[in-house]
Amino acid sequence: MKHFYIILISLMGMASYGQTTKGVVVDEFGNTIENAYIVNSNTDSHAHTNELGMFSVDKSQVGNVLKVSALGYKKLNFTVNSSEVSIVLEGDIFRLDEIVIQQQLSALNVISKIDLETTPVNSSQEILRKVPGLFIGQHAGGGKAEQIFLRGFDIDHGTDIAISVDGMPVNMVSHAHGQGYADLHFVIPETVEKIDFGKGAYYASKGDFATAGYVAFQTKEKLDKSSISVEAGQFNSLRTVGLFNLLGNQKKQAAYIATEYILTDGPFDSPQNFNRVNLLGKYSAILNDNSKFSVSASRFSSTWDASGQIPQRLVDNGTISRFGAVDDTEGGKTSRTNFNASLSKPIDENTFLKANAFYSKYDFELYSNFTFFLEDPVNGDQIKQKEDRSIYGMNAELNKKVKMSDWDASFQLGVGFRADATIDTELSHTLNRSIILENIKLGDIDETNMFTYLNTELKFGKLMINPAVRLDYFKFNYKDKLASVYKSQSETEVKVSPKLNFIYSQNNNLQFFVKSGIGFHSNDTRVVVENNGKQILPSSIGADVGTIWKPFPKLIVNSALWYLYLEQEFVYVGDAGIIEPSGKTKRMGADLGLRYQLNDWLYFDTDATYTYARSIDEVKGQDYIPLAPDFTTTGGLSFQNWNGFSGGLRYRYLKNRPANEDNSIVAKGYFVTDMNVSYEYKSVTFGVSVENLLNTEWNETQFATESRLKDETNSVEEIHFTPGTPFFMKAKIAYKF
């Protein structure tokens, strides 16, 4: 290990090889362009711009011609006139044939860029659906974080997927409702600039919860124009959005304010009374040394009522409709306030530092009743889950590239921490939201995660080898406020997560990859201290083998075979306040996706996933993993700027899947289609969108639950579900200025 660090330090200090042209690529407004592709037509040497738009091309000199291309920009032949250049690209229509498959671990991110360009998001739910193979479901009146499904995982609300926005974590550790709870509703969809995602645990910069994968959202640095829009639709639905550019199109600085307000009663017999308010302010600047600095503040709050999950037997016998309720006093309220500052600083043409620091204030209060009168035949089983949380944190990463005669290397050294302080994390048995019948759990939680990682990319021509390692330190502390005497419990744990990936790029149109790595998700502090720190950071061990292929200029295909093993663990059940074991599991599957541009304005995309998911230690036939997706597919046609018209037709299909361990109860699948169309005339856009175009009867979320109704003697275990949205039409008008 000592010799390794000596070699590393030596490499990072070496000078570039041969003559070099270095520079930056920007658009007409001065915004830096990431992942632009630069090729020296005289020597065939090439490079990509980094996050700051900077590049360095070796074997290049004055008089050479650089061919520069980037998705969404016109190609440019640039004649080198000095050793340092600034290249300006002009915006253009989206062209799939301009895509270059890059020799990097996150090469698949080009898929999300394509999808954002061709099918822009207009709801917070659609943001997560941009990740191929990821399904979501809402089952609490619109205010609760979505239930997530990916790679054979019922991720619940985020246990096995790490989600972040501008470097701020979205997942909540030791949350009152469930571990990893990730409420993304504070993001205004129109402000999303980039979606970075990866499946599996192969990324050193991603730690806690990144077992099935990660999703990292990046908001816009600036707005081209200001705009206001109003949407109105069925079920007393209203949404207004305001985007206000405060500084115009200055090249060195930008500032904007974004607002969103949503009201709806939903299709339910008992109105949801849902409302949500979002506010975001962001300032960005390019400093004299080409550093990029930004600071943002946001506020989100939401309240709602919910009909809850209903038992199939009541719908079958006609007692209630699919949109009825057993206990319509469910619901809740939540809020989140964020402050975030980030800096990307170039040190030289091959080195830069990026860092961000953040603070979040979060409140949550949820009322649920999943079992009705099973535990309390008189008052019912309603529960309250509540918490008041503060989150502090920082991420920093040093990036260094080294160019040798016949191979290149790059290094990312990262450090950071996250500290959560939660006051009065509560689970109580309640009546009609107003009376606390029993405090089941009540306490304060302090949890700290400090980490470091080293990621290395060694490029030998067409082959890139990517060894990496991550080190995480956790400290858990719980103060039980229901104990008769003062009781504060604490545990610490260290986790080492190695990764090893291979990427072979045959050319700019064909890439093969083998990825492998160990990841983990943390467990609730209440599990950690009660289980004396044992089996609290279960490992996931996984591998992917796949390709990214561009057989034709306007067609890109991605495919992968994968395997994932998850260790046994003990988990905290937030709805019951108990700890139960979760056995070892294995998942394997296949992913396939394609993107095709039929002409300048018409696009087609589809993704399909197959998964085989089983518990390892259970006997055959009793080893199904409840709600694990088996087969899924999504896709659609979209068109952009065809004589002023834009729109699309999309579908999503989720196959029937087991709802319990022996598959005796089945969660029914669904096939749902959505449609939207808009027309832009000068500065005004008119649009119509329809969810569930064919008015399909489907269950958005469903569980095998044992419950008892007030007039029942015995309990019944069966499907309890939240119905999916029926035919739902909205109209929209927007004005840009």
PLM features: residue spans?
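Face-selective signature of the C-terminal outer-membrane beta-barrel domain
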Residues: I286-S301, G332-K481, S505, N509, ...
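Membrane-embedded beta-barrel scaffold of Gram-negative outer-membrane proteins
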Residues: S344-P346, F352-F370, S505, Q511-G519, ...
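Short strand-turn segments of transmembrane beta-barrel domains in outer membranes
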Residues: F197-A204, G213-L247, T259, P267, ...
